[in-house]
């Protein structure tokens, strides 16, 4: 079934660690982190432009911090 979601105003005051924002139908399986980004994104009011500083310079030998674990609730791919 096709759905349409209209969002006119969305305000998220803070997210940390392995946080995410989901809108609509979705399936998350084992929350795998394949990239590590450090930074900040901020605005000074509801109508001000957004400013961000993202630094992606980290030395980490393991690509994936959490393994790809099969979830029995996920739909089969047959």
Swiss-Prot record:
Native source species: Bacillus subtilis (strain 168)
Q: Which InterPro entries match?
A: Spore_germination_GerPA
The annotated region (Disordered) lies at 57-78
Name of this chain's protein: Uncharacterized protein YdzH
């Amino acid at each position: 079934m096709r759905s349409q979601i209209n969002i006119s105003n969305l305000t998220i005051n803070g997210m940390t660690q392995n946080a995410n924002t989901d809108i609509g139908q979705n399936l998350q399986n084992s929350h795998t982190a394949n990239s590590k980004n450090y930074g900040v994104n901020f605005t000074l009011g509801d109508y001000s432009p957004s400013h961000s500083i993202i630094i992606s310079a980290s030395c980490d030998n393991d690509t994936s911090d959490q393994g790809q674990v099969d979830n029995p609730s996920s739909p089969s791919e047959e």
